[in-house]
Amino acid sequence: MKIFFLIMAVAALGLGGCTAAHYYERQSDRVTFYLQAPGAQQVVFACSLDEYNPHPAGKAGDSRWKVSVTAGSEFRYFYIVDGAVYVPDCKFYEKDDFGSRNCVYVPE
């Protein structure tokens, strides 16, 4: 019985860290980005598709934000959360000209 509870405790701890703070979903020629930003008042998405023009994200739940863009090719992106640049954990990164990095979206 102790082994069962130990296994369940380890599984619960492992699953607790699986909540993604950032992910995307592709729908034909568009991609929708989601960002978990608890307490944020404003989230903006900026990408290289249009020279980093701001795309205001909309609320998609209590602390989740979403924004959709056309996605036919690879592009770089980041978020601005309450006025501060935020680069989430991404599969692909690229250094920018300012000593930081941007996420890179690569169509699958």
What does each model-identified segment do?
Residues 12-15:
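Bacterial Sec-type N-terminal signal peptides, specifically the leucine/valine-rich hydrophobic h-region
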